[in-house]
């Protein structure tokens, strides 16, 4: 369930093992997504099923295509890079220290991956949204008191274009990404074990590319004709808590990455040539569930309203819910939307003013 990076690579691995995967993707194919992304800028409205996070390729398809990680929990990076090259990515990524495909090149690569899945006997269904999991003991999981320990044997899904419901039988991989909050709500209401994890929370910094080039290359003239747009990496500890740069996009854009109405959150991306006049990077602090417990408790009435709007049972909420990090995200994103005049226009200020907790009079 989901055709982002997790779903794509899981499908390709299953094909290697002799299986024919069925991929269910709530969003549209990678080309059709472009129209909905354009509408975010034109109309300031976000399609809850097709946006910068939902659709073929997931959140990464139109947000850069950087292919490196600082995580210690990883498998064969070389194998992943080779799969990208087999599907049309530039072979430079096999040698680059920080491999990067680029937002303008990645959609074609993803399309080729989908075609491989289909040619090998798999199926890919777009605008097909999971409704519920099917359990071995009860058949259909509909009640929040379903017995724990049941084996999942399939999913029920709805075609968003036609309204038709379909049943798909077999083992299930949930590759729905971090933004499919309706999936987490469903899992919690069905009493399927989920666990809160820490997240990184922060802001996105934007600077003139030439400024970063001058600093990083120690040259007032910048990078010249032959050097790439400069990157930077920042890591430190503040009061025992990690603070670090994230998703640095030299010569790129800041983009709206909300997945529904009344939300505002941003991401960054770069085209393959990294040639724009601006560079940007996330600057985040690690945040743990215990950090937000009091905040969530203080906003319980707001959360209950959100739950009712999501057609969930608000009584399921407790201050120590496994969903508390998700609730925290939703509240902060709504507050940012309100500060952005209830549009997809991100509020901004100078970084020096932000860290000193004062208003900016200009940018």
Residue ranges and their predicted role:
Residues 1-363:
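Residues forming the flavin
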């Amino acid at each position: 369930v989901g055709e982002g990076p997790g779903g794509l690579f899981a499908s390709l691995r299953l094909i290697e093992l002799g299986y024919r995967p069925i991929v269910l993707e709530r969003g549209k194919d990678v080309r059709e997504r472009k129209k909905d992304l354009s509408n975010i800028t034109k109309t300031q409205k976000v399609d809850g099923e097709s946006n910068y996070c939902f659709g073929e390729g997931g959140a990464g398809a139109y947000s850069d295509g950087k292919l490196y990680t600082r995580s210690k929990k990883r498998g064969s990076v070389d194998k992943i890079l080779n799969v990208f090259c087999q599907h049309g990515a530039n072979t430079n990524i096999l040698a680059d220290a920080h491999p990067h495909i680029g937002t303008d090149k990645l959609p074609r690569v993803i399309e080729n991956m989908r075609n491989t899945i289909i040619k090998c006997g798999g199926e890919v269904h777009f605008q097909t949204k999971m409704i519920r999991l099917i359990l071995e003991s009860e058949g259909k999981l509909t009640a929040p008191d379903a017995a724990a320990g049941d084996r999942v044997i399939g999913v029920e899904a709805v075609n968003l274009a036609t309204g038709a419901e379909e049943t798909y039988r077999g083992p299930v991989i949930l590759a729905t990404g971090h933004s499919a909050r309706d999936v987490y709500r469903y899992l919690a209401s069905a009493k399927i074990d989920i666990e809160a994890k820490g997240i990184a929370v922060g802001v996105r910094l934007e600077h003139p590319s030439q400024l970063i080039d001058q600093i990083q290359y120690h040259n007032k003239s910048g990078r010249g004709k032959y050097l790439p747009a400069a990157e930077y990496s920042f890591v430190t500890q503040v009061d025992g808590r990690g603070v670090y740069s994230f998703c640095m996009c030299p010569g790129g854009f800041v983009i709206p990455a909300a997945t529904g109405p009344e939300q505002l959150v941003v991401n960054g991306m770069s085209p393959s040539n990294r040639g724009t006049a601006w560079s940007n990077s996330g600057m985040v602090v690690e945040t743990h569930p215990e950090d937000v417990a009091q905040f969530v408790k203080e906003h319980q009435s707001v959360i209950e309203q959100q739950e009712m709007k999501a057609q969930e049972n608000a009584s399921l909420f407790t201050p120590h819910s496994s969903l508390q990090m998700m609730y925290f995200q939703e509240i902060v994103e709504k507050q940012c939307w309100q500060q952005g005049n209830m549009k997809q226009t991100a509020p901004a200020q100078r970084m020096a003013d932000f860290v000193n907790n004062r208003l900016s009079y200009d940018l």
